[in-house]
């Protein structure tokens, strides 16, 4: 069982992929209040869940601190057409104050949309209703199979109940103000027959008011993610060719564009540290994955992930070299 580490307000929320806030230069700000997940999906790109063999720590951020820092980014980017996307490297539904978080974000001037990604495995009607009243505008629901046996296999979780998830879909569509985007991961050779079923179900249930109702995702292999035995990622050409076939067959939009979600470029927070730059840091906690540590820059303006750091104790001060800095997600190694 991974340890749960609470991120104090002395630890910047910009810099670490596992928690906090991510700005990728658009009007979307990713919000990551917690890293835990109840499922251990066999294709998970972030190796989440209780069966993870590479995670050593899970993180949780106090919701007041998260909202305070989020508002600063909104002010920097411009108080208009901002989307707060609660996505995490786990499942946001595990965050104890998810309703309070949605409510607080919805009250920030300039925030137009609050969306959330979830498998819905622990969602219930009471929580869905509360999220709707709090201001949640869209749920991106990861639904990868309708066949119960295959759904359990993909989730690698025997208690996962896809029929319950489908019932929740119906409730969301019929009884809440939340738009539903169904977002299956298509794993070639594994759930090929399930994707058309999911398309039919979504066409029947969902009439999204403001967004597309389907967003089929391409299975990819990630450095730290789980690899599905026997599954090989398609080329992007083959993937989009098949989406167009399904579009014609089911008369539904499947090839999506950022504009479909109102996504546009917006000024990005400066990246203060360049690749290969030497930086002084202080180790403040355990890292997300094994052999990592969580560190903060000497200036206190960014968090970073310190790799190859299993022997470095918490509290240590040292020089490190930045090896990655895209979108202010900083990875460094000891010098």
Q: What would you call each of these model-derived segments?
A:
Residues 298-314:
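Beta-strand/loop nucleic-acid-binding surfaces
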Residues 252-277, 307-309:
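Short boundary/loop segments of OB/S1/cold-shock single-stranded nucleic-acid-binding domains
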């Amino acid at each position: 069982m991974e340890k749960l580490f609470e991120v104090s307000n002395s630890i910047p929320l910009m810099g670490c992929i596992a928690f906090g806030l991510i700005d990728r230069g658009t009007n979307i700000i990713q919000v990551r209040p917690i890293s835990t997940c109840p499922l251990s999906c066999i294709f998970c790109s972030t190796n989440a869940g209780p069966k993870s063999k590479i995670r050593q720590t899970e993180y949780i951020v106090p919701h007041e601190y998260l909202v305070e820092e989020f508002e600063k980014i909104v002010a920097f980017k411009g108080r208009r057409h901002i989307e707060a996307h609660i996505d995490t490297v786990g499942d946001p539904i595990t965050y104890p104050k998810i309703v309070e978080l949605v409510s607080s974000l919805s009250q920030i001037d300039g925030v137009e949309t609050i969306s959330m990604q979830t498998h819905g495995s622990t969602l219930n009607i009471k929580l869905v209703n509360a999220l709707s009243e709090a201001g949640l505008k869209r749920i991106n629901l990861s639904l990868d199979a309708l066949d119960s046996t295959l759904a359990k296999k993909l989730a690698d979780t025997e208690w996962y109940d896809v029929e319950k998830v489908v019932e929740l879909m119906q409730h969301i569509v019929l009884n809440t103000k939340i738009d539903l985007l169904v977002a299956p991961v298509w794993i070639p050779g594994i759930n090929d027959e399930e994707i058309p079923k999911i398309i039919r179900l979504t066409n029947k249930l969902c009439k999204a008011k403001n967004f597309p109702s389907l967003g089929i995702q391409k299975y990819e292999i990630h450095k730290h993610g789980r690899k599905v035995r026997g599954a090989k990622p398609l080329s992007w050409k083959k993937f989009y060719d098949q989406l167009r076939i399904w579009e014609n067959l089911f008369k539904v939009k499947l090839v999506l564009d950022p504009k479909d979600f109102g996504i546009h470029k917006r000024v990005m927070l400066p990246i203060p540290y360049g690749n290969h730059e030497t930086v002084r840091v202080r180790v403040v906690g355990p890292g997300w994955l094994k052999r990592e540590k969580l560190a903060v820059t000497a200036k206190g303006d960014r968090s970073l992930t310190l790799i190859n750091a299993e022997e470095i104790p918490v509290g240590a001060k040292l020089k490190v070299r930045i090896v990655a800095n895209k979108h202010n997600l900083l990875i460094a190694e000891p010098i």
